[in-house]
Amino acid sequence: MSNSILSKLNVGERSPVNRTHSSRTEAEKSSLFRFVRRKINSPWLACVPLTALIVAIWNAAAIAQDTEIVNITVETVNENVATLQGTLNAIWILIAAILVIFMNAGFGMLETGLCRQKNAVNILTKNLIVFALATIAYWAIGFSLMFGSSGNPFVGFGGFFLSGDHTNYGLSPFPEGLPVAVFFLFQVAFSATAATIVSGAVAERIKFNEFLIFSVLLVGIAYPITGHWVWDAGGWLYTMGFMDFAGSTVVHSVGGWAALAGAFLLGPRLGKFVDGRPGAIPGHNMGFAMLGCLILWIGWFGFNPGSQLAADQACAYIAVTTNLAASAGGLTATFTSWLKDGKPDLTMVINGVLAGLVGITAGCAGVSYWGSVIIGGIAGILVVYSVAFFDKIKIDDPVGAISVHLVNGVWGTLAVGFFNMEKGLFYGGGINQLIIQIVGILAIGAFTAIFSFVVWAILKQTMGIRVSGEEEMIGLDIGEHGMEAYTGFVKETDSFGSAVSGATVPE
């Protein structure tokens, strides 16, 4: 019995009293667990708002810091964009300057092709050396007379030998970041163009030394003074509102007036006028002439768009108006010479293209596409009749430089008063701009013509400007340079020394 009782006690058969006590104990343990858990969790629950506050403060600080960083970044980006734009401007103007400088090769090819082979070396030498002379003369005094900020409305002064900065030359209107050196190079290319124009009109009879002297004075004094009137912000024509975007007058008419004075005082070539009537003296290489024209056409895409002085979208518009005018000039000159003389003359086609380019140069940035076609088309017609006119009055111009650059430089400058989309007469701008254009043409023409005539006359009286008749007959290649452009060829000439054919030397 005792074992049975023990087994019951040890095996676990509990009485109802024991089961009740056990249930109460478990409930108490559960309640205690929940109590303890609540006590333990309460501090962590209190940390939730604090944590949220810390996170909010952290985010606010981060946002403020990010805003500051964004502001700094925007300022840095703007500075970098401005610097990049300035660099692009400088690169574009440098490329444009190189294109304009290469136009000297075009002038050399054009003039050589339209003249006789016995004068080819002389013409090539003049076109090459004139750029070197122009660079030195314009560097020494020309750039300062044109843009020096210490001058007055009639002439600039200060910063000779390119010794100043933007403040010395008054370049503040020009785009930010454009170096003075780049602007100088672009302008010196323009100045050389004015002197090169003269070379063609006085070709085949001008003394080499005297031509160089005149070129230095033109580029160093006359061209910068009139250029100051128009392109410097303090110039009197600039203040008046005269418009010549890329130089129909400042470059081309100036060169044309100087050429006219020189051709007049030189007189015609031997054999040009027989019994008072003009005779043809054909050029020796039309291939050279055509190639020269094409080089000039390409170079004009630096000449006109480069005058924007910035690498922006306006350059493309200017390039299109320039190309349209050149094309229209070439076409109208072709058909005009065809109708006038019965056949299309290649020399007139060439001069028509160049006339269109000269004509659009003043207004290329401010006329419509249709306006550029009309301006170029009229220029092509003018050049054909202008060449005939100067022949009639016995002004001998071997390459038609006066007709291309002077006549159409004047026309292109006048055309601004008609076709400019803001101030032109045909666009409701009234006659005021046209009057201003006429004043500028007359003022620059009078100054340049008088200056050139006086200088040529002094040179003629003191040193002589024309080679001897014998030297002209032999050719300036031998007389002035002691060499020939084409060795190994026999040159057949007419009674006036004009080469009419060539043949290889027989063995």
Curated annotation (Swiss-Prot):
Transmembrane region positions?
A: 44-64, 90-110, 128-148, 154-174, 178-198, 211-231, 245-265, 286-306, 315-335, 347-367, 370-390, 399-419, 438-458
Indicate how the chain sits in the lipid bilayer: Multi-pass membrane protein
Q: Which GO terms describe its molecular function?
A: ammonium channel activity
Give the region (Disordered) as residue ranges: 1-23
* GO CC term, one of those recorded: plasma membrane
The lineage's top-level taxon is Bacteria
- Which terms are listed as keywords in the entry? Ammonia transport, Cell membrane, Membrane, Transmembrane, Transmembrane helix, Transport
Q: Which Pfam families match?
A: Ammonium_transp
Query: What PROSITE patterns does the record point to?
Result: AMMONIUM_TRANSP (PS01219)
- Sorted alphabetically, which InterPro entries does this protein's record hold? Ammonium/urea_transptr (IPR029020), Ammonium_transpt (IPR001905), Ammonium_transpt_CS (IPR018047), NH4_transpt_AmtB-like_dom (IPR024041)
Q: From the Swiss-Prot or TrEMBL record, state where the protein is found.
A: Cell membrane
Q: Which GO terms describe its biological process?
A: ammonium homeostasis; ammonium transmembrane transport
Primary location group: membrane
Stated family:
Belongs to the ammonia transporter channel (TC 1.A.11.2) family.
Q: What is this protein called?
A: Putative ammonium transporter sll0108
Where is the organism placed in the taxonomic lineage, from the top?
A: Bacteria, Bacillati, Cyanobacteriota, Cyanophyceae, Synechococcales
